[in-house]
A protein has these predicted regions:
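Metalloprotease/metallohydrolase-associated module, dominated by Zn2+-dependent proteases
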Residues: 2-53, 58-59, 64-67, 87-214
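Active-site recognition of the HExxH zinc-binding catalytic motif
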Residues: 72-85
């Protein structure tokens, strides 16, 4: 799917039930072009400020996100919009001003039953010091991952048992050896070299083979 500008009313099919009524007044208060776009590996959403050529706020969100990830990403970008309105380009993108604004934007959505309990717990912990992306917070990422459309034969490294083999996107094969506090120590089967993997990386499970190439 390429980029597709969408009506605010189409948001209803992408966000949790009951949240659209909270979102709509924000869009009524600002001139925003909302775009749904294909999956982007390095970014879930994006905010662009008005320019002379395009005198309106622009927000884009990846259309492949589950409804809870979609809403959180949208709120993330709405906070960027408000920071621009108040500070223009005088503050850093994810500095204290954005963190404070994101908390304020998020508060009305907490405790309303819009998120599953596990996601809301992780979200409350995350928003105490929000990072530039939910992908960098293991607790929130794992909670949201549970609501993604299942991908057969794939798991997070954290969810593998020691001894299980897996394949990365690049086709390299590893065996999970040991789970540490924030990472897992894994052996590359072809070379015998050890590597450390973040627990929130999604990998493809493969059958364990007899012997090792290395």
């Amino acid at each position: 799917m390429g980029k597709q500008e969408t009506s605010i009313h189409l948001l209803k099919k992408f966000v949790p039930e009951g949240s659209f009524e909270l979102i709509a007044p924000f869009f009524a208060s600002h001139t925003i072009h909302l775009t749904l776009t294909h999956e982007r590996k390095s970014v879930l959403g994006d905010y662009r400020n008005p320019t002379r050529e395009q005198p309106f706020h622009r927000i884009s969100i990846n259309v492949n996100l589950n409804r809870y990830s979609f809403l959180i990403t949208l709120l993330h970008e709405m906070a960027h919009l408000l920071v621009f309105v108040h500070f223009k380009h005088t503050v850093s993108p994810h500095g204290k001003e954005w963190k404070a604004q994101f908390r304020q934007v998020l508060i009305p959505y907490i405790g309303k039953g819009l998120f599953p309990a596990d996601v809301e717990r992780a979200l409350i912990a995350y928003v105490k010091n929000p990072a530039a992306s939910t992908c960098t917070d293991p607790g929130l990422f794992k909670a949201l991952y549970r609501y993604d459309e299942p991908k057969p034969g794939h798991k997070l490294v954290d969810d593998l048992e020691p001894g299980q083999w897996f394949e990365t996107e690049g086709g390299r094969v590893f065996e999970k050896i040991e789970e540490l506090r924030t990472r897992s120590r894994c052996l590359e089967v072809a070379t015998g070299r050890m590597y450390f993997f973040q627990g929130i990386i999604e990998v493809k499970l493969i059958p364990r083979q007899k012997g090792r190439i290395a």
